């Protein structure tokens, strides 16, 4: 394996568009009709279908191919408890791996919360958005001590 220098690592993460992941459209967007279908008023129809049958979220949204990579940065490999924001490059890196090796889209989510119950409540509150949740670099005792983890 090649030796990675501090300078090379910082340049890799900052060159061009900063970060390692982005969101790109999957539907046409070049005409007014496209935009009206993507947003208002056309977006109402899939919303109403999902309201009737929540499983339709997998048919009409990105949910089925979308994973949340969530961390509070309390146990980042080799770095320890560096905090939620400082762990963001790691979560973006995990997102890159999901995308290139499995074709799965990822949102990295850094939760600035060390209280186990509050952290788990935050994750549960956003869970409907995602087809999967990947908890990453979280001190194990934070999850095992929570009563909410049993739910």
Predicted feature residues:
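Metallocofactor- and cofactor-centric catalytic cores in central/energy metabolism, strongly enriched
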Residues: 2-143
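Conserved small/polar residues in nucleotide/adenosyl-binding loops
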Residues: 144-150
